[in-house]
Every structure is written in structure tokens, then in C-alpha cells.
């Protein structure tokens, strides 16, 4: 009995990072390939899936002859190695011309063994006419490997699709595809995996051999394949990065102005969000990080230091706030609303200078509890912390905020128990104030019980990426799954989720 084996298959990234932007079809988003690859691994984290092997099935870059091709390949190599997962990379026709491809990915034709499975790498010849051919020696290689490894379940990896035939003027399949199929069938190959044909072809079986063509990661709907192998049993689950659900308004996405941001880039984030089907992508930034220098901001001391707050507010720039206002205003569009994530200071006041609190400056304010005045880590008891928390929630909800961010995250970050008995209390407070509750998975685990309680009280739900890294933009699978746990189907989204209408 073979051990189950999970395979992540990705194809046709056509990455153009440092390389010049070649004349690609408008539908091919090669410039986003590295980000989409990051998003694939983030999706796997959310699905709690750790593949046994990652395979990339060719055309990693758009032009192997470009002078920057090597650097673009190295960028993709870094994304693969940082995962700690084993991987195999197959060259495609667009990778030709880069002399260092095989060296970078340590790829070689032939057998690569992982557990009970033998992966046969084929490096087929691509002609100038775009036709491809499997050599006689490569056909014999299949037979040799099968005879020498009778207990291995064999998986064939190549760039060009083998089966089924494709109706196209472009010669996607090898000219000797029929011979290849006969070789697979005679030698007991379990599965043939290919790329090249960007639309992909779903799993099918012919003469006892499974065939699957993996779609391009950089064309809608930005798909990769999760494949489960168990002996000769094969199952394929296709995962798309593009949202298939309506009414996703993301109010909570950070910018490069945040001290806690990592790889976020606002211009790229807005383009990515639209590409992935986010209905409206807004930006919001921590007010306390804009007003104060990093060390002081992250200490939370400003909550009690009214003298320092006033000193900063009296300076013309208010540290970085004025610059952020100019930046945010240029982002405002029908697709993008601008806001701030605001905290309390001085026993219940909003940390917002009078000049920054004018009504028409911001489309929305998000209320957050990152710090609690009078809370002393390690000394304040659970019961005392709960009282302080309710005090601050009540104070926030009397201020002009539209959403309460990551409602109970303070307890998690303070190493306290999440007070689930307060769910109905906070939900009632939100209902009375007309403020939405946020679903947030940034360093936090939202609870379906709380969301369900809020919905029962007609509290709107705001889904939030709370993106600090670029790959977090547009990733709402955990939010959607949580809503399902709370009894909310996608058809109910327009009625349940927060919007500006």
C-alpha cells in the first residue's frame, strides 16, 4: 500500500521582473508572477496543506535570452527555497536561451525519487517552428526506468501537453505524442503532468494513464493544482487565486507608510486587488505610526503622554501624517477609498489631531485596540483586562468609526484567554452603535461563534485582509470559510457584508 503523497503543480509564470516587458498578450500577467507565487504558498498555509513536492512545469520567465533572465530566475528560485519544500523545475520553450537555468534549479532529465514515487523529468526539444519532439533516447529512458524501478509509481513531467489533442493552429503537443502515450501505457506510468497550454486541461484517463495539463498561474483565474497521489489513484483539486464571490470590500489594507508593513506596495496592491476581483480596495494606515517615531509609536507610551502628543500635533508636519494625507488623497478613486486605523489615548479620546479629524478628509475610520490604558502585562488579571476592554470598546463606539478592527485580538496578543462570554455583549454594543465587526486573519484567528452572534443581531461584517505583505492582498479564503461556518453563503454576502451603499 503506497503512502499518500501531496503534489503542488504550477505552470507558465512568464515572469518579467527585471527583464524587459516582452510583447505578451494582455491576459498574461507575467509582471505579477512572483507575487502570485507568494500567494500560492500563503493559500496553502490557510488550507493547512504542506505538499511533499512542488513542481513547476516550465516557462518560468518570458524570455530566456533577455540579459536579466538569470536574475528573474534567481528571484523565483528564492521564493521556492524559502518555503523549505522540495521542488522540481522543468524548462519550457520560453526558458530557452538562459545558460544558467539547469544550474540554478539543479534540474536534470531522468528519475527523481520521492518516497514511493518516481518523477521522470523530460527536457524535450523545441524547434524554431514551435514544434516539439521527444527524442528516441528519452522514449527509451521511460522503459529503462520502469524496468529498473518496478515498485515505484511513475509520474511523467514535461512542459508540452501530451493528451488530449488540442484544437489550435499552434502546435502545443509533441509531434510524436502518440508514441509518448504508448510508452507511458506500456511502462505503467501513473500520471503525466504538463503545462504550456495556458487554459489547462482537467484530469482524464486514457489506457490506464492519467493526464493533467496545469493552467497558467498568470492568466485568469490564476490557477494552480493540488494533486493527491495514493498508489495509482490520482485526485486533482484546482485552486484559483481570483475571487469567485461578489461584494468583497476590503477597508483594511496597509501601505508602505506603516512601520509594521513588510513587502506591501500600495500601487501594486491596488492593481493586484482589482486583478483578483476585489470589489473595492481601500487603504488605511495606523494613525499612531504616522504621528510618532517608530520606537515610541510601538511602545504605546503615547496613550498616557498627552504632552508629547500635543507637541507632535503642533508641528507643521505632525511627523508623517501630513505627507500621508497627500499620498492617500492621490489614491482616492471610485475603486479606492481612504481611511485611518485609529486608537484611543488620554482615557477615551481619539488619537486624531483636530486638523486630521475634518469630516471630508477620510472616507472612513477603523477603530482599533492595540493598547489599553491601565493594562499592565503580567499583572492585570483576566477579569480586570475584560473590564478595561469593554470600557475601551464602549468609548470607541461612541466615536465616528465605521468598523471595529480585530475585535478580540488584544487578548491573544496579551497572552490572555479570549473571553467568549463577552461575544453577546460586544455584539449588542456594535448593533446599538451601527458599527461593523471585522473578520481579520492577520496574526489573529477570528471566531465563527462571534461572527454568528453579530449576524444574529444584524451587525454588518467587514472582511479585512489587514495586508502588511503584498501576498496578503486579495486573499479571503479563510474569511469566506469562516463565514460559511457562521452560516453565511456567498448569496447572502450583499446583505451581510459591510459596504458603503
Regions found by a protein language model. Name each.
Residues 244-251, 255, 398-400, 414-501:
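Charged catalytic cores and adjacent phosphate/nucleic-acid-binding surfaces used
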Residues 1-68, 244-269, 275:
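N-terminal active-site segment of His-dependent metallophosphoesterases
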Residues 14-21, 62-65, 93-100, 127-131, ...:
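Active-site environment of divalent metal-dependent phosphoester hydrolases
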Residues 32-109, 113-114, 298-326, 330:
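Core catalytic region of metal-dependent phosphoesterases/phosphodiesterases
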Residues 37-53, 130-210, 391-396:
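His/acidic metal-ligating clusters that form di-metal
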Residues 244-346, 383, 414-415, 420-428, ...:
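An N-terminally biased module of ancient metal coordination in phosphate/nucleic-acid-related enzymes
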Residues 66-148, 153, 176-186, 206-213, ...:
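Extended active-site neighborhood of metal-dependent phosphoesterases/phosphodiesterases
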Residues 3, 144, 201-246, 467-501:
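Binuclear metal-dependent phosphoesterase catalytic core
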Amino acid at each position: 500500500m503506497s503512502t499518500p503523497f501531496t503534489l503542488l503543480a504550477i505552470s507558465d509564470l512568464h515572469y518579467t521582473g527585471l527583464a524587459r516587458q516582452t510583447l505578451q498578450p494582455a491576459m498574461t500577467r507575467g509582471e505579477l508572477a512572483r507575487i502570485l507565487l507568494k500567494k500560492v504558498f500563503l493559500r496553502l498555509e490557510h488550507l493547512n496543506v504542506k505538499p511533499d513536492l512542488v513542481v513547476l512545469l516550465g516557462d518560468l520567465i518570458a524570455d530566456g535570452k533577455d540579459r536579466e533572465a538569470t536574475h528573474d530566475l534567481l528571484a523565483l528560485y528564492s521564493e521556492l527555497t524559502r518555503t523549505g519544500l522540495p521542488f522540481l523545475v522543468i524548462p519550457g520553450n520560453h526558458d530557452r536561451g538562459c545558460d544558467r537555468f539547469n544550474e540554478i534549479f539543479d534540474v536534470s532529465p531522468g528519475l527523481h525519487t520521492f518516497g514511493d514515487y518516481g518523477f521522470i523529468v523530460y527536457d524535450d526539444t523545441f524547434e524554431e517552428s514551435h514544434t516539439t519532439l521527444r527524442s528516441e533516447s528519452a522514449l527509451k529512458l521511460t522503459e529503462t526506468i520502469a524496468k529498473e524501478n518496478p515498485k515505484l509509481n511513475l509520474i511523467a513531467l514535461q512542459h508540452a501537453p501530451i493528451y488530449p489533442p488540442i484544437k489550435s493552429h499552434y502546435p502545443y503537443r509533441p509531434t510524436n505524442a502518440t508514441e509518448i502515450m504508448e510508452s507511458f501505457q506500456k511502462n505503467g506510468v501513473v500520471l503525466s503532468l504538463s503545462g504550456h497550454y495556458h487554459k489547462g486541461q482537467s484530469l482524464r484517463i486514457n489506457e490506464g494513464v492519467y493526464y493533467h495539463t496545469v493552467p497558467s498561474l498568470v492568466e485568469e483565474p490564476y490557477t494552480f493544482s493540488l494533486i493527491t497521489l495514493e498508489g495509482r489513484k490520482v485526485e486533482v483539486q484546482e485552486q484559483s487565486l481570483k475571487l469567485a464571490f461578489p461584494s468583497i470590500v476590503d477597508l483594511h489594507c496597509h501601505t508602505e507608510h506603516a512601520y509594521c508593513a513588510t513587502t506591501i506596495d500600495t500601487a501594486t496592491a491596488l492593481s493586484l486587488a482589482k486583478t483578483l476581483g476585489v470589489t473595492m480596495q481601500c487603504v488605511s494606515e495606523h494613525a499612531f505610526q504616522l504621528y510618532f517615531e517608530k520606537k515610541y509609536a510601538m511602545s504605546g507610551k503615547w496613550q498616557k503622554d498627552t504632552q508629547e502628543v500635543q507637541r507632535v500635533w503642533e508641528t507643521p508636519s505632525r511627523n508623517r501624517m501630513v505627507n500621508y494625507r497627500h499620498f492617500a488623497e492621490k489614491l482616492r478613486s471610485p475603486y479606492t477609498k481612504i481611511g485611518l486605523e485609529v486608537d484611543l489615548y488620554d482615557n477615551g479620546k481619539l488619537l486624531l489631531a483636530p486638523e486630521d479629524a475634518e469630516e471630508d478628509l477620510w472616507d472612513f475610520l477603523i477603530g482599533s485596540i492595540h493598547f489599553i490604558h491601565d493594562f499592565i502585562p503580567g499583572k492585570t488579571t483576566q477579569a480586570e483586562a475584560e473590564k478595561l476592554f469593554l470600557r475601551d470598546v464602549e468609548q470607541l463606539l461612541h466615536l465616528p468609526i465605521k468598523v471595529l478592527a480585530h475585535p478580540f485580538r488584544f487578548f491573544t496578543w496579551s497572552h490572555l484567554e479570549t473571553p467568549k462570554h463577552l461575544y453577546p455583549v460586544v455584539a449588542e454594543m456594535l448593533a446599538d452603535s451601527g458599527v461593523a465587526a471585522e473578520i481579520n486573519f492577520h496574526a489573529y484567528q477570528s471566531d465563527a461563534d462571534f461572527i454568528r452572534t453579530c449576524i444574529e443581531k444584524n451587525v454588518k461584517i467587514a472582511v479585512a485582509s489587514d495586508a502588511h505583505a503584498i501576498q496578503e492582498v486579495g486573499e479571503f479564503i479563510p474569511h469566506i470559510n469562516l463565514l460559511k461556518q457562521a452560516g453565511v453563503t456567498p448569496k447572502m454576502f450583499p446583505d451581510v457584508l459591510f459596504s458603503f451603499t
